[in-house]
Amino acid sequence: MMKSFFLVVTILALTLPFLGAQEQNQEQPIRCEKEERFFNDKIAKYIPIQYVLSRYPSYGLNYYQQKPVALINNQFLPYPYYAKPAAVRSPAQILQWQVLPNTVPAKSCQAQPTTMTRHPHPHLSFMAIPPKKNQDKTEIPTINTIVSVEPTSTPTTEAIENTVATLEASSEVIESVPETNTAQVTSTVV
């Protein structure tokens, strides 16, 4: 885009002195009997537009797309490509996916109608080329030099009392005296 802009500015900068000289000659009284022209009118009037279009193919019809290899749905692409899915969506939803109107400058001086749409030519830019991996490099494993301190576990002892009433089948009156068993349980608390 910038190359084409600089190209147009350069061509205009080269042609403006000739056009300015012609206007100055018209303002001054004619000193010579014979009117001299240093350039051909037929060539000069075609320089700004037709010369650029015919000499530089980037301004003319571009049959081969000169775009970098990138995904179609890439968010960094400056031009919008909308994929039209075939069988995934219903026809009512497919109508929402339309190609934006043509923003390419017209080849002639006349403005193009806005109803004309740009149909992208099929190209292989949807294939992403993976970067080359350097096989010469060997990966150096990273060693964590910071040692994490783990808390030490301290055993705790708890006394658990099991109260079990033993009933014996006898004719004597048995008082319900519970037996107490004491067991030590060790657990690690972090």
From Swiss-Prot:
| Keyword Oxidoreductase on entry | no
Where's it mainly located?
A: secreted
Q: Keyword annotations for this protein?
A: Glycoprotein, Milk protein, Phosphoprotein, Secreted, Signal
**Where's it found, cell-wise?**
Secreted
Q: In which tissues is it expressed?
A: Mammary gland specific. Secreted in milk.
Disulfide bonds, paired cysteine numbers: none
An example GO biological process term is:
protein stabilization
What residues bear Phosphothreonine in this entry? T166
Positions bearing Phosphoserine: S148, S170, S187
Its signal peptide is 1-21
Its GO CC terms are:
extracellular space
Which InterPro entries has this protein been placed in? Casein_kappa
Site residues by UniProt (Cleavage):
F126, M127
Q: Does the entry feature the keyword Phosphoprotein, yes or no?
A: yes
Known glycosylation sites: T142, T152, S153, T154, T157, T163, S170, T186
The record's Pfam families line, in alphabetical order, gives: Casein_kappa
- Give the similarity note: Belongs to the kappa-casein family.
UniProt function note: Kappa-casein stabilizes micelle formation, preventing casein precipitation in milk.
- What is the protein name given in its UniProt record? Kappa-casein
- Gene name for this UniProt entry: CSN3
